[in-house]
Amino acid sequence: MALSAQQIPRWFNSVKLRSLINAAQLTKRFTRPARTLLHGFSAQPQISSDNCFLQWGFKTYRTSSLWNSSQSTSSSSQENNSAQSSLLPSMNEQSQKTQNISSFDSELFLEELDELPPLSPMQPISEEEAIQIIADPPLPPASFTLRDYVDHSETLQKLVLLGVDLSKIEKHPEAANLLLRLDFEKDIKQMLLFLKDVGIEDNQLGAFLTKNHAIFSEDLENLKTRVAYLHSKNFSKADVAQMVRKAPFLLNFSVERLDNRLGFFQKELELSVKKTRDLVVRLPRLLTGSLEPVKENMKVYRLELGFKHNEIQHMITRIPKMLTANKMKLTETFDFVHNVMSIPHHIIVKFPQVFNTRLFKVKERHLFLTYLGRAQYDPAKPNYISLDKLVSIPDEIFCEEIAKASVQDFEKFLKTL
């Protein structure tokens, strides 16, 4: 068993003490050269106790210095052998036998060190040893936040560097547990390379993964198949990149679902293939969101607001958000524009962006123009004001070019409302 860092000094002192004792015994017994001592030390008078320790040190912690020491000891042994070559042959033979037995004893001593049991955890230690102990903080068995695991997880650390907001992911326990089980090199690296190939920039990866953390549970080959399907429908690489950025969950849907969604909009709206493709590129969440708001709004335009089918087609291709807009907002905006401002359907169809504007902004500007006597929305009459200019330009230009008044006058009027 290998010795721990705390056990080395203690074993070093004990072995060194034993080597000194054996060295003393060695001196007394030198007159009997054929006899050897236990614990791996040979009966050669010219080998000091320090050399003996370095030569037969810890088996587990052998280093280059130990090897050099053993080499120097070997050279000393060779000098001794040459010096004793003039002695009787029996003395040389006895010396060789002694060295062989000593090497065998050293092997036994090393094996004995290896088999020594570790120190007991209840054994007292000094203050210096206690200070040197560095204990890692324990991994919490359970937690409500991923912050407790960041120091222990390389995956979480690298996701944070990418800009992933773990505080949002931890609100979904299943997703948080999934991240803790993932290996960055095996499970996440290839996914990041795939997303970059699709068109997600480095500075967009953090926000994308924060929103669509479920993509890590998707099979990479399935994701590639879905991208290939979009390309087969003549969506360019730039189109796919734009769609994935605007609708991060797009790639989580199967090819069958994507195909059904494209077919629904082409059939329901009676659009051409190109117009259907342009529609979903501008608003890709049409492929990922619920179809119920779309179906409901189509009924509202036809039955409640009174638009014709071709008029609906024109408006939604201009402003795709009209398909998913809030029903109440649509009806309130139409009621004010059509019934209060007296703007007919055919003019509203030409400027459908009015449905994408905050209603209070339309009301404020219309009431200010009415106060000034300039609320004229009939293109056949002079001083005509289009809906486009009414809702799209900033206050400074509206006051200067449309209302022919100052911004201060407009602000004073708003205080009276």
Swiss-Prot record:
It comes from Homo sapiens (Human). Highly expressed in heart, liver, kidney and testis. Detected at lower levels in brain, spleen and lung. Belongs to the mTERF family. Residues 69-88 have a biased composition (Low complexity). Keywords: DNA-binding, Mitochondrion, Ribosome biogenesis, Transcription, Transcription regulation, Transit peptide. One of its GO terms (biological process) is negative regulation of DNA-templated transcription. GO terms for cellular component: cytosol; mitochondrial matrix; mitochondrial outer membrane; mitochondrion. Residues 69-96 are annotated as: Disordered. It is found in: Mitochondrion. GO terms for molecular function: transcription cis-regulatory region binding. SMART domains: Mterf (SM00733). Residues 1-68 form a transit peptide. It comes from the Eukaryota. Gene3D superfamilies: Transcription termination factor 3, mitochondrial. Contains seven structural repeats of about 35 residues, where each repeat contains three helices. The repeats form a superhelical structure with a solenoid shape. The gene is MTERF3. Binds promoter DNA and regulates initiation of transcription. Required for normal mitochondrial transcription and translation, and for normal assembly of mitochondrial respiratory complexes. Required for normal mitochondrial function. Maintains 16S rRNA levels and functions in mitochondrial ribosome assembly by regulating the biogenesis of the 39S ribosomal subunit. This is Transcription termination factor 3, mitochondrial.
